[in-house]
Amino acid sequence: MSLQADFDQAAQDVRKLKSRPEDEELKELYGLYKQSVIGDINIACPAMLDLKGKAKWEAWNLQKGLSKEDAMCAYISKARELIEKYGI
């Protein structure tokens, strides 16, 4: 399989986890996903009162500078770790 196909499959598989991962795990996965699909963050930081939006922005911003390919590899690795931990 190609890297893109592996990434797409991992993105589908994490939606099927038997239980919800911890918030930190979800934020890391989100940041890697956005970096894989879009690249470096291209939106302004949300207002302080938008806690969920700010957390997502920060998770994506942490991945800034990572190439899309490296982000995909990291996403796949994290997805496999979560699948092993939580099952599908």
UniProtKB/Swiss-Prot annotation:
Ranges of residues in domain ACB: 3-88
Species this protein is from: Mus musculus (Mouse)
A molecular-function term among this protein's GO annotations: fatty-acyl-CoA binding
Protein name: Acyl-CoA-binding domain-containing protein 7
Pfam families membership: ACBP
Residues engaged in binding an acyl-CoA: 15, 30-34, 56, 75
Gene3D superfamilies from the UniProt entry: 1.20.80.10
Entry similarity comment: Belongs to the ACBD7 family.
Function comment: Binds medium- and long-chain acyl-CoA esters.
Superkingdom of origin organism: Eukaryota
Keyword set, alphabetical order: Lipid-binding
Coiled coil feature spans: none
UniProt cross-references to PANTHER family, sorted A to Z: ACYL-COA-BINDING DOMAIN-CONTAINING PROTEIN 7, ACYL-COA-BINDING PROTEIN, ACBP
Tagged with keyword NAD: no
GO process annotations (BP): energy homeostasis; G protein-coupled receptor signaling pathway; gene expression; leptin-mediated signaling pathway; response to food
